[in-house]
């Protein structure tokens, strides 16, 4: 089962399987030698490709030379891929996060080769959106949260459908929220999504999150945001 865009893209070109390691304390503390023997050695590898700055194992002590030596003894071809540059700067996840933090979605999309997305499972919330006529799907967030904040026009990928909507990524200050939450309102949609996985594609930033004096003010602004989102997504 490959639920996320990154995982699906890993299998686009003639790849039958994709294995993902759970990066926990055990894996983090594993020596390079143990990683080679316990992980790579059990996968029947014939060809291995890594980035030219790739390090692995505890304290990043493992490198290309170590893998190449292991490969020569075990009939495994090990190849380094070159660094890809945009101008004089290296493509990197930190550069993408920096672009997103600055709301430069155009640059982020150019670096990613697509728009920024987040895939997650819909979890139960406090149902506030439903009480003000704007039901939302709340997504479970990783501990690291997301490198964005504010209100966005979005496309929601659910099963084989692409749905239009609006999302808020933030702490919901109007109701005294403290923890970051990603809430998504899907236009003209009333299916139960609890427990389902959806993918949110962030298309345009509408505004920053702000604290309103009361729920009526919040509701009024949300409806304005919805109209703006529809215009941006349909145009």
Where are these regions (language model features)?
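Single conserved hydrophobic/aromatic residue that forms the stacking wall/gate
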Residues: 1-8, 12
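Residue-level signal for inorganic ion chemistry
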Residues: 9, 48, 108, 154, ...
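Short, structured coil segments at secondary-structure junctions
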Residues: 13-14, 74
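Short, well-structured secondary-structure segments
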Residues: 16-22
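Contiguous mid-protein beta-loop-alpha structural module that forms a pocket-lining wall or clamp
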Residues: 26-109
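Glycine-rich, Lys/Arg-enriched anion-binding loops that position phosphate/diphosphate groups
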Residues: 71-170
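Phosphate/ribose-recognition catalytic cores of enzymes acting on nucleotide-derived substrates
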Residues: 125-235
